[in-house]
């Protein structure tokens, strides 16, 4: 056990005592001495175990109606002293301060008091001072001290005691310290939220660098961004970034990160309306724009390649809000900067967070960021006809786009160019029809194109419609109870299909 420490003295001061008896009993069996206050001391003594009063250690009684009980050098000195530091040990010996190896404390029920509708004075009295100080002190000195900061930690601590007694490893102490800081952070956030809005159960992100936006999604809404945009981008030109700009920028970054080869994408309302992968950035731009030159107006542009002068000259013919690239030639910047409000961003190499958050109802959804990028090895052929190598490349290409489109979504692509997509439809058939109509409006030939769907096909209808337009290769997750009907259609009509699920 790395840097093992044995618990000899425990300070216990809790508001909730349910489940504490098992821990106290086991600690007593291990020879641990107890130090406590008020009701907790009485509880320990009621179990038949001796317990020294904090007042006897400090020689000060609890004062100010209980507001000051443990706030004393003889308590905090015993917690914070560094056992391996000779100066600290000499001082606690000089002032007769006992070492405290374990702190078990919980906090006054601030949130519950707020939720009960109590008057403000009653709420203020539930702002814990001594408890939060004990938590932070013990957690800070986790090299020598174990901190149990809530009932939620009783079970893992009890299990630890049962496994190897009152001896702890540094890893265990550090884990409990981490949990303790989570408790203190949450508690302080709840207090902040009360004073900020009086809700008591609101969510506060642990982020700084608040940036006030011009407005939210609509002009009558206030908007803010919490985070560090400077770590993600250098804004080298243009107006202040808006709430809606940020939504599109986020979608653009998620999308372009799917591609390794030179790619250009145009987004409107968080969906790609044009995208192409090509040997040069100029070719990628031209073919991305060709996918939907109408919707591209006022869009957000993103590429994973350096923008040169020739490409900038072509881009400059279009009105757009934002452009994102890893870098720009000097001449390209001069051209693109001719429009004073145009937002020009240089993408840095900062990694995106591993988790994504979305607020809804009275809470927050959290999920891992989807970083999976399918390769040919991940595809499962479910049709008798195998896709060609070119079709596989196009299917993987289309799958990256549909993954980053609003469901229900269908993408039609050919030769690594987005021909058209149908997004945000309540019917998958309608999404396909929208994509077909759009592709035809820009005179694309769908023969030889591939289709990607962001979810399974419950019926063969979409495949049948696409087949009649000349689409002979389909990629989809699979997983419908009626998958076999779709697979059967493919076999009867010579359509190649692969699944990713």
Predicted regions and their residues:
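N-terminal glycine-/serine-/threonine-rich phosphate-binding loop
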Residues: 1-57
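Glycine-rich nucleotide/cofactor/substrate-binding loop typically near the N-terminus or early
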Residues: 39-109
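Active-site/ligand-binding-proximal alpha/beta "capping" segment
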Residues: 83-132, 136-138, 384-389
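Active-site loops and adjacent core secondary-structure elements that bind or stabilize anionic groups
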Residues: 152-328, 332-335, 339-369, 391-400, ...
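Glycine- and Gly-Pro-enriched alpha-helical subdomains that act as flexible
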Residues: 273-293, 417-463
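C-terminal binding/interaction regions
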Residues: 320-325, 330-342, 464-501
């Amino acid at each position: 056990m790395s840097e093992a420490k044995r618990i000899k003295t425990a300070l216990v001061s809790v508001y909730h005592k349910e489940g504490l008896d098992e821990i106290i009993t086991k600690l007593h069996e291990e020879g641990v001495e107890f130090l406590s206050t008020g009701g907790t001391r009485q509880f320990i003594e009621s179990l038949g175990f001796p317990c020294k009063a904090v007042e006897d250690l400090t020689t000060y009684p609890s004062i100010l109606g209980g507001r000051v009980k443990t706030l004393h050098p003889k308590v905090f000195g015993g917690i914070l002293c560094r056992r391996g530091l000779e100066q600290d040990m000499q001082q606690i010996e000089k002032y007769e301060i006992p070492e405290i190896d374990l702190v078990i404390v919980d906090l006054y029920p601030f949130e519950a008091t707020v939720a009960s509708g109590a008057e403000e004075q009653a709420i203020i009295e539930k702002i814990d001072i001594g408890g939060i100080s004990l938590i932070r002190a013990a957690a800070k000195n986790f090299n020598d001290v174990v901190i149990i900061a809530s009932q939620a930690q009783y079970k893992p601590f009890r299990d630890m005691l049962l496994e190897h007694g009152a001896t702890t490893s540094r890893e265990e102490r550090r884990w409990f310290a981490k949990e303790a800081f989570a408790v203190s952070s949450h508690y302080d956030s709840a207090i902040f939220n009360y004073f900020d809005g009086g809700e008591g159960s609101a969510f506060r992100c642990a982020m700084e660098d608040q940036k006030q936006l011009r407005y939210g999604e609509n002009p009558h809404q206030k908007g803010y961004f919490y985070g560090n945009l400077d770590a993600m981008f250098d804004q080298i030109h243009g107006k202040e970034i808006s709430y809606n700009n940020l939504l599109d920028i986020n979608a653009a970054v998620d999308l372009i990160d799917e591609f390794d080869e030179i790619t250009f994408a145009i987004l409107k309302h968080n969906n790609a309306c044009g995208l192409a992968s090509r040997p040069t950035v100029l070719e990628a731009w031209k073919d991305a724009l060709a996918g939907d030159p109408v919707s591209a107006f006022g869009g957000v542009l993103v590429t994973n390649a350096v923008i040169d002068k020739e490409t900038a000259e072509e881009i400059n013919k279009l009105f757009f809000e934002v452009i994102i690239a890893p870098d720009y030639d000097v001449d390209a910047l001069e051209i693109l900067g001719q429009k004073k409000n145009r937002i020009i961003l240089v993408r840095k190499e900062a990694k995106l967070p591993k988790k994504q958050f979305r607020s809804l109802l009275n809470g927050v959804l959290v999920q891992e960021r989807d970083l999976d990028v399918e390769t040919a090895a991940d595809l499962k052929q479910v049709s008798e006809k195998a896709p060609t190598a070119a079709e596989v490349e196009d299917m993987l290409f289309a799958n990256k786009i549909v993954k980053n489109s609003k469901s229900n979504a269908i993408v039609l692509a050919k030769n690594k160019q987005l021909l058209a997509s149908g997004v945000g439809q309540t019917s998958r058939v309608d999404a396909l029809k929208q994509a077909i109509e759009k592709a035809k409006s820009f005179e694309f030939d769908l023969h030889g194109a591939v289709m990607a769907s962001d979810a399974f096909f419950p019926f063969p209808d979409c495949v049948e419609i696409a087949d009649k337009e000349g689409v002979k290769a389909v990629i989809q997750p699979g997983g419908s109870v009626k998958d076999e009907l779709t697979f059967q259609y493919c076999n009867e009509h010579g359509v190649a299909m692969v699944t990713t699920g």
